[in-house]
Amino acid sequence: MDKDLRSVQEARDLARLGKIAANKIATYTNEQIDKILQSMVKAAKENAVCLAKMAVEETGFGKFEDKTYKNHMASVMLYDSIKDMKTIGIINEDVNQKTMEIAEPMGLLMGIVPSTNPTSTAIFKAMIAIKSRNAIVFSPHPSALKCTLEAVKIVHDAAVEAGAPENIISCISLPSIQATNELMKHKDIALIIATGGPGMVKASYSAGKPALGVGAGNSPAYIERTANIEKAVRNIMASKTFDNGTICASEQSIIVEECNRDAVIAEFKKQGGYFMTSEETSKVCKLLFKDGHTMNAKCVGRSADVIAKAAEISIPEGTRVLIGEQCGVGPDYPLSYEKLTTVLGFYTVKDWHEACELSIELLQNGIGHTMSLHTEDRDIVLKFTQKPAARILVNTGSAQGGTGASTSLMPSFTLGCGTWGGSSTSENVTPLHLINIKRVAYGIKDCDTLASSDITFDYPELKKELRDEKQNGQPSFSLNSNSEGDSDEKMMSLINELIKAMKGAN
């Protein structure tokens, strides 16, 4: 049997076993689930560093210290946020309205894992699946296979040790497009959680199954005139260099005003930003993008030094981010697109009105995802809430802010983009997205007096019809009326006469 056939068979086997596990865990109590989650968190924390190192060594993307923090976010921080979340039994009850909401698991989930955040995504999706009493089977990116398999094994073994069913968390070990497609369309898969490239997310939504997918990011960061420039630049630099820019919520372009342009540039230079010449920008763009604005995978998650050397440009020691000035958006301005690495576009506008227009243009290439602004003016924040972005972050780095590390958003590595970006949700995905909710509703009104007891049910024309019926002694519209039947009989009679006449003529 060749590899593709074996991978397809493996996908089928994992789905079958996962469904059995899903049926078992569906009966677990909150206490049992919490015990399992605590065991998974403990194991993930103990292995956070080694998993991070494995991911960097295997993919070449990012920095192991930041991937360690991602693993920490996906386990320790996530657990703190969801431990008291109601996902089992009665999750809401309104005594006055006599309604109840009952949570039920979805069953077997499929999780797609990207190469940029492999171990943290696997841990995260496993955690939210278990919290909602679901089983999950992963489809890993081939370039991150080993570290993903190890992350899945660690949390699976910890879960089983704490009482979870065998095969509750599993992963394809022979990844192929055929296996992924087989899993997506398998009858036992209830929901697909898709985190990855646009093609994979689109395929998930085309599989004929419910899916939670994410769109591409292209986050602009607007430094408004009232901003604390030093703090704004510090947050942006910390965000863009976090794991070398692999988080899709990270800043992609900086927007400044004419009045603060010089101060912002000076602060970026002070904090390790290098402003490239137009010639250097052109060299970097040719390196970063292939076939239009498709990013060169070899440049994803690389340091500024690595990018500069590959582009054959000289940069000062200590450079953390490469910055290229742009004067437009679109194919002629490559840095106006998403760059999951340590490179930023830089724009200058006259005022907030122009910043609004430019932000909307930039967001078209990552619509629905995230944007950030740095300002002390609340009115400016409210104006920017009209932009097509599901996460509008204020005075924080967008990588950490969007994923919930530096904000009060729910910690998540699956960030919905709403219908703007072709997603079924605009939220950070949590266990609450992975449950079916039954609604129990008691009758609170008598069915036979609904109209008569409703003072707003007042239609004069209806009253007139009822009066006419009463006066005439019969309803205006009766089921016993033969008007339609009489018409039909007359029509058939005419047709028959016409046929006879035609025969006579022959």
Please give the residue ranges for each predicted region.
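N-terminal Rossmann-like NAD(P)+-binding subdomain of aldehyde/semialdehyde dehydrogenases
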Residues: 1-100, 128, 270
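ALDH superfamily catalytic-core signature
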Residues: 5-8, 201-330
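Short, flexible turn/loop "capping" segments at secondary-structure junctions
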Residues: 14-16, 213-215, 244-248, 333-340, ...
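Structural signal for hydrophobic packing residues in well-ordered secondary-structure cores
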Residues: 19-22, 26-29, 40-48, 52-55, ...
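Conserved C-terminal structural/oligomerization subdomain of aldehyde/semialdehyde dehydrogenase
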Residues: 26, 313-506
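Flexible, glycine/charged-enriched surface loops at secondary-structure junctions
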Residues: 27-31, 163-169, 244-248, 274-285, ...
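Rossmann-like NAD(P) dinucleotide-binding subdomain of oxidoreductase/dehydrogenase enzymes
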Residues: 90-231
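Residue-level signal for inorganic ion chemistry
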Residues: 133, 192, 257, 307, ...
